[in-house]
Amino acid sequence: MICITGTPGVGKTTLAGILRERGLEVISLGELIRQKGFVLGRDPIRGYLEADIEAACSHLQEMEGLDVVEGHLSHLCRSCSMVIVLRLHPEVLRGRLEGRGYPEGKVLENLEAEALDVCTVEAFEIHGERVHEVDTTGRSPHEVADIITDIMNGSRVCPPGGVDFSGWLLG
């Protein structure tokens, strides 16, 4: 099971649709959590659903024929054979999140997470060398899907650390 993760707005769901069109069995971790009720509660300050990641990941392991799991928490599943972290320049990400109508506080929280490599760091702490990092900035969804396909086939390697948006925080 390959897990595709990244900050909200980097293109995970769009990419998942393309991979599905290419014949892969893809599931959204967020949809699974909501549909199966893998919810522990709600964050009292931010209002986010708190997911029962262990239960969701355990359920995923039982699913047959599953190729790809996408979602911004998917890298927390220890059973991922490979993790691909999608990255996007924070200024481009800002436009996408604002376009979705995210409140300013949520936009800033996600921009900071992207600039600080939060998903990449978390993924690497759990999965080590099985993590790949792809900068989607300036690339079409199909170009990103081609890169992901190459990574999945072993013909391309995109180790973590090659994408750095930390300078955005200082600018």
UniProtKB/Swiss-Prot annotation:
Keywords: ATP-binding, Kinase, Nucleotide-binding, Ribosome biogenesis, rRNA processing, Transferase. GO terms for biological process: ribosomal small subunit biogenesis; rRNA processing. Its EC number is 2.7.4.3. It comes from the Archaea. Transmembrane segments: none annotated. The keyword Nucleotide-binding applies. ATP binds at G9, G11, K12, T13, T14, R100. It catalyses: AMP + ATP = 2 ADP; ATP + H2O = ADP + phosphate + H(+). InterPro entries: Adenyl_kinase_AK6, P-loop_NTPase. Residues 99-109 are annotated as: LID. The keyword Cell membrane does not apply. GO terms for molecular function: adenylate kinase activity; ATP binding; ATP hydrolysis activity. Residues 28-51 are annotated as: NMP. Broad-specificity nucleoside monophosphate (NMP) kinase that catalyzes the reversible transfer of the terminal phosphate group between nucleoside triphosphates and monophosphates. Also has ATPase activity. Involved in the late maturation steps of the 30S ribosomal particles, specifically 16S rRNA maturation. While NMP activity is not required for ribosome maturation, ATPase activity is. Associates transiently with small ribosomal subunit protein uS11. ATP hydrolysis breaks the interaction with uS11. Belongs to the adenylate kinase family. AK6 subfamily. Interacts with uS11. Not a structural component of 40S pre-ribosomes, but transiently interacts with them by binding to uS11. This is Putative adenylate kinase. It comes from Methanothermobacter thermautotrophicus (strain ATCC 29096 / DSM 1053 / JCM 10044 / NBRC 100330 / Delta H) (Methanobacterium thermoautotrophicum).
